[in-house]
Amino acid sequence: KNPESVMRSYFNWTEKPPANEMDKWYLPKDEKGKAIGNAYYYGYFSPEMPDWNYDNPQMVEEAKRILKFYIEMGVDGFRLDAAQHIFNDHNKNIGFWNLISAYLKGLNKTVFLVGEVDNSFDVVAPYIKPLDACFDFDLSREVLKILKTEDAATFTNQMEKIVSHYKKANSNYKDVIFLTNHDQNRLMSEVKGNLAKAKQACCILFTLPGIPYIYYGEEIGMKGEKPDEFIREPILFGPEKNDPMRTRWMKPQYNNDKSITPAFLQVNDDQSLLNHYSRMNAIRKNSNALRFGEVASSALNSKNVMAYYRIYNQQRYLILHNVTASPVTLTLDDKDRLLNHIIYQNSKQTIVNANLITLEPYGTLILANDR
């Protein structure tokens, strides 16, 4: 508000906003909410979130000073929100992240930088040169589409495109895989409360290549739909009367003791979503193929079944997900018949004989050539 402030230039100002961006420039307001002055400030997301002016070298140095503070505190990495919106130009953004990455790696060569770039993989790919990883929004959207439509026909093609683009940009790239985040309707709401689909989503997440990220509450089946405050409701650790850790900044619309089983109670239920996440996490943690392996398509992929391999040295896994509400029977070829160790299966899943497999509705099967 103060034109004389030394920090005035930390923000973007103009008296003549561009005609095509009038909805992103705002006049400051006084304590009574009345617009003041004739200079507009820029806020890409909202008037409550003015953008920093990183064309100002002083602002860049201020950001570096803050980052250094946290590095010296022992922070191992940063999640970089809206990494494509530093400037309104992708090349300029990438130049900025090259500068920041070099600075941080100079302070701690193992610092990990993950960028949130909500865009198609061809736009995201250049960002994984300065950054260690980016959230894979395309893969997330593909998985959600499969879960909702029960149609996996396009999965192999989409996965191959994503992997190819990212490898060309950075052969050592690390994918960051997720189901939903703080800007999207929650998974359990997207699948209409279907617990079997929520469990399968977890199986998909933990068997795809990359680093799995879990949005808080996803592991206990929290629900929520836009606007943002309703997809960011307080997590339920225990029953409300015995839950001093539960935050109460708002009255939840979707998540309470009647609609969601709190985490502490799910711990004691072997079939709970939380314990399912724990099991899949343990399987992944103990498998080099799932943690580090390459991904390859399988001829078994179809409308009804997501199918892919995870391969690490001599270790070979075949991952099968029946994405439909009906049983599906598959015929294994001679090569797949050699994968005769079951790493994971749903409780009712049955192998009919040596080369026929029946997957239960929303069932997942992981086969391997060794344990």
Language-model regions, residue ranges each:
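C-terminal beta-strand-rich structural cap/linker in extracellular carbohydrate-active enzymes
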Residues: 352-371
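Loop/helix patches that line or flank the sugar-binding groove of alpha-linked glycan CAZymes
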Residues: 107, 181, 186, 192-317, ...
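The substrate-binding groove and active-site-proximal loops of carbohydrate-active enzymes
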Residues: 45-60, 83-92, 146-150, 185-193
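N-terminal small/glycine-rich loop or linker at the start of catalytic domains
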Residues: 31-55, 178
